[in-house]
Amino acid sequence: MAIYFLHSYGIIHRDLKPENILMTDLTLQADLKLLDFGLSKIIGNEEKCTEPYGTLSFVAPEVLESKPYDKSVDLWSIGIITFLLLCGYLPFDDKHSEKEIARQTVQDPVPYDKKIMSKYSPEAWIFVDGLLQKKPEKRYSIKEVLEHPWIKKMDKVPKERRDSKNDSKFGFYTSKME
C-alpha cells in the first residue's frame, strides 16, 4: 500500500530494497514503513526519468540500459524483494562483478528454482513473474499488484490511506507537533 500511496501522489521511490523497509515490530502483523527517500522524485503521470539511480541488485533493466523510466521501476524492485524473501537469494547473482549483475538483470531470464517453487503456491510465482518482466509495459501495474489473488489472500492489506485523522498513533504524535 505504501507504493500505491506514493505513486498516487506522483512520487517514485527509486531505491526500494530490504534495507529501506522497516518493520514496526517482530510479529507477523507488523506494519511496514518505507525509509530513505533521498533518491525519490515527484513526476507527472506521463513523465519519465532518465537519472541512473537505485541499488544495482534491485534496479530495473530499463534504468541499467539508460532508457527513460517511470514508476514501474518501483514494481520491479518489489519483485526482486519478493523473490529474495521466497528464495533466500537474489535472482541475479550478487557474487559477480557489478558489470555481470547488470548484464544478468538486462539479458538473463529470472532463474526460478523448481524445488523452491514447489514450496509456495503457483499464485506466488505468477505474482513475482508479473513484477519481474524485463519490458516495463508488460510489468504489473500497482493496481494489478493490489488485485492479484496472492496479495488478496493476505490477512492484512489496508485498503485506505492513513492520515492523522484516521490513525490514532500518528495523530497523537502530529498533534503534539502542531
Where are these regions (language model features)?
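Conserved catalytic-loop aspartate of Hanks-type protein kinases
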Residues: D74
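Conserved C-terminal C-lobe helix
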Residues: K119-L132
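Catalytic-loop of the protein kinase fold
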Residues: H7-T24
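Structural helix C-cap motif within protein kinase domains
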Residues: C87-P91
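Conserved activation segment of eukaryotic-like protein kinases, specifically the C-terminal portion
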Residues: T50-E62
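Terminal C-lobe "cap" of eukaryotic-type protein kinase domains
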Residues: Q133-P158
